[in-house]
């Protein structure tokens, strides 16, 4: 059956700021306390979406979350009106305010893990929400992510959206950022590669930075998504690269159809994995980048592998890259050599995503890949699909509500909270989502 990959990109939230909340993500740590520009951030993302949609790659949007997230502060014991809580937490525990104001939901590669209908035992598209257990600010996301996905993929005859795994470290799950699918045509059955950083009975794990994904979680997600057991491979990421800042697999590898583009040090038993894939995937091609050409540290600094690998109509592939790759002499030299060689990657497109990149999120972080047949695509909420009208409407919406300068101190401003809620209220109507946010639900804003 004919199917296409649709990229659902996250809209950057109104409270996008640099707080250094994500230990193990070196860009996040390095840019802590810098002044951010939320309006520029959301527009950089929109430009990427529209350019790819105009080039013929189906594109849709996933909205931001409600931030600052007052219900979480109430759970932490802060009382009073919303405004009083903001004032108290800003004075008593500003770190908590930064955490509940994080715009991290924009990186929707961590929203869920997706199984196309061609791979599922019941023939439906499955999405399992990620619990993002390793970081407090991200562990807040799952309930609203689930509500948003149910509002987008609402036809239960075509889609199954599963709640996140229990919030315990043993089941730490980071979503599609640790998941690849390889195969031929999108509509044919593929091989799903689940990548983990640790497992309970295995002492091989990173020493410096946390391994966020457990094998136990990956196995549970594969079961929930009803992935045919004959079409699954579980592989461990190289713990040494996690300790160099590769906090998700999509910082060191990206796949599309029959191609796996990765660093030679990406996986713990890479030769064994490559041989498995060669046996299981017709026409499989591994493009392994040697450390002599691009070091792991340069790959992390430029987000070379946090790129999007997209199939064009002629069978060739386009590599969508952040501008940091073009700015790095060695990485850009390697990329120009790559597209000149005999492989499916024949073109590159560079985008300026510096607002997101400074917090440790490149092109691949900003999108959730969902393979859909034509019938399934028609069943998706049509209001989220990118086109000229939506692009114009979202830019006008951003101009109206987003600030062009934000610091950590601004997060305590009650006006920012009100601006955010008004903006999301308008957005839910624009995208026909219903009342997906806690503040929209009766009594939620009052605790």
Swiss-Prot record:
Its EC number is 3.5.3.23. One of its GO terms (biological process) is arginine catabolic process to glutamate. The keyword tRNA processing does not apply. Homodimer. Catalyzes the hydrolysis of N(2)-succinylarginine into N(2)-succinylornithine, ammonia and CO(2). Belongs to the succinylarginine dihydrolase family. This is N-succinylarginine dihydrolase. It comes from Salmonella newport (strain SL254). The lineage of its organism: Bacteria, Pseudomonadati, Pseudomonadota, Gammaproteobacteria, Enterobacterales. The gene is astB.
């Amino acid at each position: 059956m004919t199917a296409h990959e649709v990229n659902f990109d996250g809209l950057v939230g109104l409270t996008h700021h640099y707080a250094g909340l994500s230990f193990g993500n070196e860009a996040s740590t390095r840019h802590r306390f810098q002044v951010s520009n939320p309006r520029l951030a959301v527009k950089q993302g929109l430009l990427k979406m529209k350019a790819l949609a105009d080039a013929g790659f189906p594109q849709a949007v996933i909205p931001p979350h409600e931030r600052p997230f007052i219900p979480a502060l109430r759970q932490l014991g802060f009382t009073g009106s919303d405004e009083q809580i903001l004032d108290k937490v800003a004075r008593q525990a500003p770190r908590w305010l930064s955490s509940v104001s994080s715009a991290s939901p924009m990186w929707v590669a961590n929203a869920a893990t997706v199984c196309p209908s061609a791979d599922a035992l019941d023939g439906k598209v499955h999405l399992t929400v990620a619990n993002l257990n390793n970081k407090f600010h991200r562990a807040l996301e799952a309930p609203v992510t689930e509500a948003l996905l149910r509002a987008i993929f609402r036809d239960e005859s075509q889609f199954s959206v599963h709640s996140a795994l229990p919030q315990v470290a043993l089941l730490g799950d980071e979503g599609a950022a640790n998941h690849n699918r390889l195969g031929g045509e999108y509509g044919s059955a593929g091989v799903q590669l689940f990548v983990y950083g640790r497992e309970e009975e295995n002492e091989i794990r990173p020493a410096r930075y946390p391994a966020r994904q457990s094998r136990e979680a990956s196995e549970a997600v594969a079961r929930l998504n009803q992935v045919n057991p004959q079409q699954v491979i579980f592989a461990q990421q190289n713990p040494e690269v996690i300790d160099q800042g590769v906090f998700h697999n999509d910082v060191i590898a990206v796949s599309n159809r029959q191609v796996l583009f990765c660093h030679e040090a990406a996986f713990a038993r890479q030769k064994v994995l490559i041989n498995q894939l060669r046996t299981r995937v017709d026409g499989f091609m591994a493009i392994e980048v040697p450390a002599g050409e691009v070091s792991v540290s340069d790959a992390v600094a430029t987000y070379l592998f946090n790129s999007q690998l997209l199939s064009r109509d002629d069978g060739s592939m386009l590599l969508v890259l952040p501008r940091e790759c073009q700015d790095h002499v060695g990485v850009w030299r390697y990329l120009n050599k790559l597209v000149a060689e005999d492989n499916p990657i024949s073109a590159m497109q560079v985008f300026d995503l510096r607002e997101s990149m400074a917090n440790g999120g490149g092109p691949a972080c900003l999108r959730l890949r969902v393979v859909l047949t034509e019938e399934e695509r028609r069943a998706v909420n049509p209001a989220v699909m990118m086109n000229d009208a939506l692009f114009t409407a979202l830019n006008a919406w951003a101009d109206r509500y987003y600030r062009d300068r934000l610091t950590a101190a601004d997060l305590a401003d009650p006006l920012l909270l009100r601006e955010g809620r008004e903006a999301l209220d308008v957005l839910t109507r624009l995208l026909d989502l219903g009342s997906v946010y806690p503040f929209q639900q009766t009594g939620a804003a009052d605790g």
